[in-house]
C-alpha cells in the first residue's frame, strides 16, 4: 500500500498564488496526497471559503490569528493524516510529478530526517534558487543556497546531504515529528526553518537535497523582497537564532557584536545609497 503525503501550505492574502499552486498539483502530481491549506488570518475573511468552494476535496483551516510561518504549518500538521508531511509554500508551481522522488529519498536511509527538492525561479524556470545549502557562519549567521541565481545546466543532478533545507518545500516523515518536534513558533517569520533543521540534526538525523524532485518558486511573494516586515524579522531573528544555537559564549558575543555594528552599518549604507530610507528604522526595531 502506498503511503500518503500530507501537503501543508499557508495562505495569507495570497488567494491567486494558492489557487495556482493547487491547480498545478492537480494537473501534474499523481502520487497519493492530501492538501491542507491553513488560512493565516487573511484580511479578507472570505478567502478560505472561496478556496473551499473551488477545491471541495481539500481541507481549508481558518485561523483567526496570524500564527506566522511556523505556527501556521504546525496547525496544518495537527490535521494531517499522511505518513509523510510536505510543508510547501503557496507561491510555488509544480510542472511535473515530484512527491515520489522526495518519498524515495526519505525512505532510502532511516537517518534522513528532512528532504528539499531542487528549487528554481518562476517564471524564469532555468534560473536556480536552491540546490542545497552551505553551512552557516557562526559569526555572520548567514549561509548561501548552493546554485542560487545560476542557470540550471545539469550541474546539480546528484542528491547529497546538506546543511539546511529550503523553507519553500520541506518533506519529513510524520512519525519523526515526535523525535525532533514541530517548528519553533517564536520567530514568526524567517529563521524558523533553519532552527528546525538544527534541531533535526541534533537528533542525529540528516538533511538532504533531492534533484529528481523540482519545483518553481515565486520568491517572497507574500511579504515582498525588501519589505519592512522582511527587514525587521531578519534582523530580530538572527539575534534569537544566535542565542539558541551558539553554545559557546565567546562566539555568541562575537556574533552579537558583528550583527549590531558591522552588519547594521552596512545595511544602513546600502539603504541610504538606494534611497530606501523608510527601511532603516526597521533595522533598529529588530535590534
Predicted regions and their residues:
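Acidic/His-rich active-site region of diverse nucleotide-sugar glycosyltransferases
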Residues: 71, 101-186, 194
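Non-catalytic, C-terminal membrane-associated alpha-helical segments of glycosyltransferases
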Residues: 229-236, 248-287
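Short beta-strand/loop segment that forms part of the nucleotide-sugar
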Residues: 32-41, 59-63
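Acidic donor-binding/catalytic loop of UDP-sugar-dependent glycosyltransferases
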Residues: 44-45, 92-105
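Glycine-rich, basic loop-to-helix element that forms the pyrophosphate-binding segment
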Residues: 62-80, 90
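Short aromatic/hydrophobic "clamp" motif used to bind/position activated sugar donors
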Residues: 85
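Catalytic donor-sugar/metal-binding loop of nucleotide-sugar-dependent glycosyltransferases
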Residues: 174-189, 194-216
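Short, acidic, metal-binding catalytic loop of nucleotide-sugar glycosyltransferases
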Residues: 23-32
